[in-house]
Every structure is written in structure tokens, then in C-alpha cells.
């Protein structure tokens, strides 16, 4: 039941921290989110790509060409994994520095979110109570029909469905009414939160124009440092890819040459 209320609440208050705002868990850092998403994406692409390569090599054409793509794929995966290990600490340092520079702004925004949460919580509790009452009322109306079905024969199934249909529609309509009422109650607070966030940014822009410039300058500085520190790792990646590409090129040329000889001999 609480999941329903939490889901509805997120519909009215947006933002990157919304899901953490209504929960007790600490939000992930930006680096953790990026790292998790990148890891999942790379793993899916790597595993899926290896499966396709393995299927191709197992085919008649793959056996005939004998390109040894799977060996090259494993070498490439190993090189990419090494790159991730080398760049990981550098990227972590970048996010740590950026979070440190924006700590004050994030604290002010979290304070606004917490204040709005306290104001809207009574409306969420009221909605949860009403929703529970509606579900309980629906359960009471449906219970006799279930007993009737158990006691009756199969031919009563259609009759039961006809009786359940209006009850389901009634529950849906009543739930929609409560949702609309909740939306109307939360709308002022949602607008208030948006106005506060806009005011924070406007204050930074006007009275704290220097602060925004400083944020931009420090972010650019951190990005430049990230690029410089990542150069050795990227160069290692390039050097690691060269043998793989050369091996693939030689295998492909040999396969084409062999196929040409077979065609000429026929």
C-alpha cells in the first residue's frame, strides 16, 4: 500500500533526488550512478557481442573464413577492462571535487525538499487511509461473489464476471476521484518547490553570478585534469588495440586470398 502512495507522490514532485526524498535510503552519488549504469551497459554489450561472435564462428562461413574473431574479442575485452581500472580512480576524484564545490547548494535544496515533505505528508497519509478504505470496501463486495462461484457451477462464471465488472469500474472511478483530490492538494506545494528551486538558481545567477562563474571554472579545471590524467590510459588502450586490429586484418586478408585461390582453381 505504501508503494502506491510513494509512486503517486513522485508524480507531483520531480527532480533527480525525488525517489530518495520519499525514502530513508541515502541517495547515490553522481559517480556511483554513472559507474553502475556504465558497468551494466558495457557488460551487456560485451556479453551480447561475444555471443554473436561465437555464433558466427560456429557457422559454416565462420569456420571457412577462420578469422579467430573470438580470440580477438577476448583480447579487446581484456584491454577495455584494464582501461576501466585505470580511469576509475581518476573519474572518482573528478566527481569528489565537483560534489565538494556544490555542497552548499545541495544542502539548501535538500532543506527545501524536507520542508515540503513535512507539509504534504498529512495529505499522503489521508490518501493512503482513503485508498485502504476503498480496497476494503471492494473486498467486502467481492467476497460473497467468490463464495457464490465456489458453490455454483461453471455456467455461473459468466454471471460472476458480469457482476464483478461494475464493481471494478466503481473502484477505478473512486480511486481516480481520490487521486484527483490528492493532485489538487499537492499542486500548490509542487509549485512552491519549483519556485524555491528557481529562486535558488536565480539568486546564484544574480547575487552570486561570481559563484556560478566559479562553479563553471572549477568544473572546467577538473575536466582538464581528468583529460590529462586519462591520457596514459587511453594511450595504453590504443597500443593494446593495435595487435588486435592487425591480427584481424591479417586473418581477413588470408581468408580473402584463400577464397580467391579456390575460385580461380574452379
Swiss-Prot record:
The protein's matches in Gene3D superfamilies, at most eight in alphabetical order, are given as: 1.20.5.20, 6.10.140.380, Apolipoprotein
Q: Name one GO molecular function term.
A: cholesterol transfer activity
Report if keyword Lipoprotein is assigned: yes
What are the boundaries of the signal sequence?
A: 1-18
Query: sequence repeat ranges?
Result: 67-88, 89-110, 111-121, 122-143, 144-165, 166-187, 188-209, 210-231, 232-242, 243-266
Keywords linked to the UniProt accession = Cholesterol metabolism, Glycoprotein, HDL, Lipid metabolism, Lipid transport, Lipoprotein, Oxidation, Palmitate, Phosphoprotein, Repeat, Secreted, Signal, Steroid metabolism, Sterol metabolism, Transport
State if Repeat is listed as a keyword: yes
Which residues are reported to carry the modification Methionine sulfoxide? 109
The primary site where this protein sits is secreted
Extract the ranges annotated as region (10 X approximate tandem repeats).
67-266
Top-rank taxon of the source lineage equals Eukaryota
Compartments annotated for it: namely: Secreted
Its post-translational modification remark reads: Glycosylated. Palmitoylated.
**One GO location term (cellular component):** very-low-density lipoprotein particle
The UniProt entry's coiled-coil ranges are none
Q: What processes does the entry annotate via GO biological process terms?
A: acylglycerol homeostasis; cholesterol efflux; cholesterol metabolic process; lipoprotein metabolic process; phospholipid efflux
Role played: Participates in the reverse transport of cholesterol from tissues to the liver for excretion by promoting cholesterol efflux from tissues and by acting as a cofactor for the lecithin cholesterol acyltransferase (LCAT). As part of the SPAP complex, activates spermatozoa motility.
- How does it associate, per the subunit comment? Homodimer. Interacts with APOA1BP and CLU. Component of a sperm activating protein complex (SPAP), consisting of APOA1, an immunoglobulin heavy chain, an immunoglobulin light chain and albumin. Interacts with NDRG1. Interacts with SCGB3A2. Interacts with NAXE and YJEFN3.
Q: Tell me its family.
A: Belongs to the apolipoprotein A1/A4/E family.
> What name has this protein been given in UniProt?
Apolipoprotein A-I
Query: Organism source for this protein?
Result: Neomonachus schauinslandi (Hawaiian monk seal)
Q: Gene name?
A: APOA1
Amino acid at each position: 500500500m505504501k508503494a502506491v502512495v510513494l509512486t503517486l507522490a513522485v508524480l507531483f514532485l520531480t527532480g533527480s533526488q525525488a525517489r530518495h526524498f520519499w525514502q530513508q535510503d541515502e541517495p547515490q552519488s553522481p559517480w556511483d550512478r554513472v559507474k553502475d549504469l556504465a558497468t551494466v551497459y558495457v557488460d551487456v554489450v560485451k556479453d551480447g557481442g561475444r555471443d554473436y561472435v561465437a555464433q558466427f564462428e560456429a557457422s559454416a562461413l565462420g569456420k571457412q573464413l577462420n578469422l579467430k574473431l573470438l580470440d580477438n574479442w577476448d583480447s579487446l575485452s581484456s584491454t577495455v577492462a584494464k582501461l576501466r581500472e585505470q580511469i576509475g580512480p581518476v573519474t572518482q576524484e573528478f566527481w569528489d571535487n565537483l560534489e565538494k564545490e556544490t555542497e552548499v547548494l545541495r544542502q539548501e535544496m535538500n532543506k527545501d525538499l524536507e520542508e515540503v515533505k513535512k507539509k504534504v505528508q498529512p495529505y499522503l497519509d489521508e490518501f493512503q487511509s482513503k485508498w485502504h478504505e476503498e480496497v476494503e470496501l471492494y473486498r467486502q463486495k467481492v467476497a460473497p461473489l467468490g463464495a457464490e462461484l465456489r458453490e455454483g457451477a461453471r455456467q455461473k462464471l459468466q454471471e460472476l464476471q458480469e457482476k464483478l465488472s461494475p464493481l471494478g469500474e466503481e473502484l477505478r472511478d473512486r480511486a481516480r476521484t481520490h487521486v484527483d483530490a490528492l493532485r489538487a492538494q499537492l499542486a500548490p506545494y509542487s509549485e512552491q518547490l519549483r519556485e524555491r528551486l528557481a529562486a535558488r538558481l536565480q539568486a546564484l545567477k544574480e547575487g552570486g553570478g561570481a559563484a556560478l562563474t566559479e562553479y563553471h571554472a572549477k568544473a572546467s579545471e577538473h575536466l582538464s585534469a581528468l583529460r590529462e590524467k586519462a591520457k596514459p590510459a587511453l594511450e595504453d588502450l590504443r597500443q593494446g588495440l593495435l595487435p588486435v586490429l592487425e591480427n584481424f586484418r591479417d586473418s581477413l586478408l588470408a581468408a580473402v586470398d584463400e577464397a580467391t585461390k579456390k575460385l580461380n582453381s574452379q
